[in-house]
A protein has these predicted regions:
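Compositionally biased, non-globular sequence tracts
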Residues: 2-4, 13-127, 136-205
Length: 205
């Protein structure tokens, strides 16, 4: 399965925030996805093992975790998180809040655009060929989240924000003590631009 087949577009400042946190943004995000996939697979197996043991039609279980996960995913009584939410009373709607924030769109009539983010300013592409997951890995995650792309965008935004906070925490006091600075930007994005333009800026990642 390939998600984000056209890549993920971010701004140069968002890229800088990522690179202030890690040396390779794509590798870090991919590593995070891999770790999350394993944790979701482990959770799925832990949740379902008692049910499998109680099912008289199950005479043996695979010793391999991936094969065991595939057995669970193939069962008639297995439901994805989206299917469970749709069957709830009342049904739980599809949540793509992270995507909405990232794209600067609205959800249910509420503006969710982040003040500093203008999607049209995005000029950097991450994962230009998309992110590839095996069907089993994707389905293990979908046991617990409604939408894969919304989940990945949430993780990406989290890393960007951590890098931004780390950068600001280090350089804001330096700027405030700099007599040559006569005015401060009114937005975080403007502050990031100011920090990146400084001759004493050193990338943290």
């Amino acid at each position: 399965m390939i998600i984000f087949s056209d890549g993920i577009q971010i701004t140069t400042n968002e890229q800088a925030c990522l690179l202030h946190l890690v040396s390779d943004a794509e590798a870090s995000i991919q590593r995070g996805i891999t770790e999350k996939v394993k944790s979701r697979r482990d959770a799925l197996i832990e949740e379902w093992r008692p049910r499998l043991h109680a099912d008289s039609s199950v005479t043996e279980l695979p010793a391999d975790d991936i094969a065991l996960a595939e057995l669970i995913l193939a069962r008639d009584d297995y439901k994805t998180r989206l299917q469970q939410d749709a069957a709830a009373d009342p049904p739980v709607p599809l949540d793509q809040h992270n995507i909405a924030k990232f794209e600067g769109t609205s959800r249910a009539g509420k503006t969710v655009k982040r003040p500093d983010r203008v999607p049209g300013d995005a000029t950097v592409t991450l994962f230009a060929s998309g992110i590839t997951l095996t069907d089993t890995d994707a389905n293990c995650v979908l046991a617990y989240v409604q939408d894969l792309e919304n989940w990945v965008i949430g993780a990406l935004m989290g890393q960007i924000n951590r890098g931004k906070k780390k950068m600001i925490a280090k350089y804001h006091p330096i700027i405030m003590d700099d007599d040559s600075v006569s005015a401060m930007p009114g937005t975080e994005d403007g502050l990031i631009t100011m920090i990146l333009a400084r001759s004493d800026y050193v990338r943290g990642g």
